[in-house]
Amino acid sequence: MKTKTKKAIKQTFVIAAVLVSVFIIVSFLALERPDSHQFEVSRTLISEQVWEYKPTVEKYAKQYGVTKYVDVMLAMMMQESGGRGNDPMQSSESYCGERGCIDEPELSIKQGVYYFSQTIKQANGDLKVAIQSYNFGKGFIDYINDNSGTYTQEAAINFSQKMYNTSSNKSIYTCLREEAKQYNACYGDIYYVRDVMEYRDELAKE
């Protein structure tokens, strides 16, 4: 009996030691997991395609003197296309006056960076005006200068309403957002600045 009892106690001790070890390992992994998960969420908010284009954006940012805005332009790419397609910066209209004329990503990025360099210059360094002008066109800069003097959400909505209401062919526009319909502001994206700035802030964490 004594031998069996000692053997049973020994087995119990071994099992307990194994369970304690497993518990410690699982607890350690649980503590580590949140940080890893946060990193994964952070990375997936910005698509891998956008990250892959970063060297190209940096190259043309240097060429056009806007290197400090690389994160902004990557954020704009994320908003425009998520980095997908042959025109990731959606630069065709500023390049040739119509959609779909660019079918080469590098040309899209070159034109997009160049166009942004022009908007930031004409906006006298007002970043939000420059960003919204990338979406609305440079006419938004003149509108701001004649009205509010700086970017506001209200100014973006009013400009979109004006351009949509005075258009001779409204069929070419679609409200990108449900919330824009209530304002009848279907020209461009009235919340472009808000979303681009959110992407930029996410990029800045990396």
Q: Which residue stretches match the model-derived regions?
A:
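Extracytoplasmic/periplasm-facing segments of secreted or lipoprotein envelope proteins
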Residues: 58-66
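Short, solvent-exposed loop/turn and secondary-structure capping segments
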Residues: 86-89, 144-145
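Short, functionally critical alpha-helical segments immediately adjacent to catalytic or ligand/cofactor-binding
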Residues: 67-84, 91, 109-113, 130-137, ...
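Short linear capping/connector segments at secondary-structure termini
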Residues: 89-97
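Peri-catalytic and regulatory segments of divalent metal-dependent proteins
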Residues: 53, 57
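Non-catalytic cell-wall polysaccharide-engagement segments
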Residues: 2-51, 63-64, 99-107, 118-206
